[in-house]
C-alpha cells in the first residue's frame, strides 16, 4: 500500500544511516499525519482522483534484536504474532477517539520501565516520545524508604487503597503505617517522574498540550 511503501522507504534510509553502528531496525508501527491530493490536505484518498498524491506519516522503529527477542518468546510459548505496534499507538486508538484528536492532547502510558507518549493535533497523531522513568522509580523509592524487597514494595503499592499498610522489612520486623504517610514519602519520586514526563511532552510537542491523559499501572499511584 501507499503507506507501507513510505514506511519501507524510511526504513531503507534508516538502515543506510546505521549500517556501521547499531545494525538493522524493524518498523513496528506507523500513523498517518496527513494525506495530500494535488497538494490539498484530505482525510482519505479513497474514492478521489487527482494528479498527485502524497502522505506524511510517523514511523516507529526498534532494533532488530529487540523485535527478534519478542518473536522468540512468543514462539517458545506456542503463540504466533499476527501484528505488532507500539503501546502508545494502541492506547491512543482505544482511548482517544478521532474527533478528540483535533485537540492538542498528550497520552502517557506509564508502565514499569518506561513512560510512552503519543501526541495528537488537528485530527492526527503527530509525535511520539518515551521517558525512561516510570513505575519502577516509585517502587525503588519504597524500597529505600521502608527497607523492603522489590516484591514487598509492589505489594505495598497495591495495598495503598486501604487506610493503613502492613509490611515486613528485610530484617523480618513487622510494621503498619498510615496510607497518608506512605504517599507523602513518595512525593519526591512522583514529582521527579512527573517533571521528566512533562519535559518529554513539551520537547515532542513544542509546547504544553491542552490536556494530558494518563494510562497504565504506573499512573494509578
Regions found by a protein language model. Give the residues of each.
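Phosphate-binding glycine-rich/basic clefts of nucleotide- and phosphate-handling proteins
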Residues: 28, 59, 64-72, 120-211, ...
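Nucleotide/phosphate-binding catalytic cleft detector across ATP-hydrolyzing
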Residues: 1-105, 162-169, 176-186, 204-211
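Gly/Thr-rich phosphate-binding beta-strand-loop-beta motif of the actin/hexokinase/Hsp70
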Residues: 98-128, 142
